[in-house]
Regions:
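A short, Lys/Arg-rich alpha-helix, primarily the initiator
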Residues: 1-15, 23
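DNA-binding alpha-helical recognition surfaces that contact promoter or target DNA
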Residues: 8, 22, 33, 63
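Short alpha-helical "recognition helix" segments of helix-turn-helix
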Residues: 19-21, 50
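Recognition helix of helix-turn-helix/homeodomain-like DNA-binding domains
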Residues: 26-41
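DNA major-groove recognition helix of helix-turn-helix
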Residues: 35-36, 46, 65
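DNA major-groove recognition helix of helix-turn-helix/homeodomain DNA-binding modules
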Residues: 45-60
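Short amphipathic recognition helices of helix-turn-helix/homeodomain-type DNA-binding modules
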Residues: 60-67
Length: 67
């Protein structure tokens, strides 16, 4: 996971862990843990929502979540 790239997109779009968590329907702690690779990974449903929120291409999704 490329957490730096995801965090840069969050900043670019004015998101915080809290706002992204609310959008995804998960806790802020869960977002933090997933970004920092502590435990669980983002689920497919969450990745799809992030893709739509930030208007990401399939290549960008691969760079962020499958690097």
């Amino acid at each position: 996971m490329n957490s730096k790239l995801l965090r840069s997109l969050m900043v670019l779009h004015g998101d915080t862990n809290a706002s992204l968590a609310a959008y995804l329907g998960i806790t802020e702690n869960s977002v933090s843990n997933k970004i920092n690779e502590r435990g669980t990974e983002f689920k497919q449903r969450e990745i799809s929502k992030i893709m739509r929120r930030y208007d990401l291409s399939a290549e960008q999704v691969r760079e962020i979540f499958f690097a």
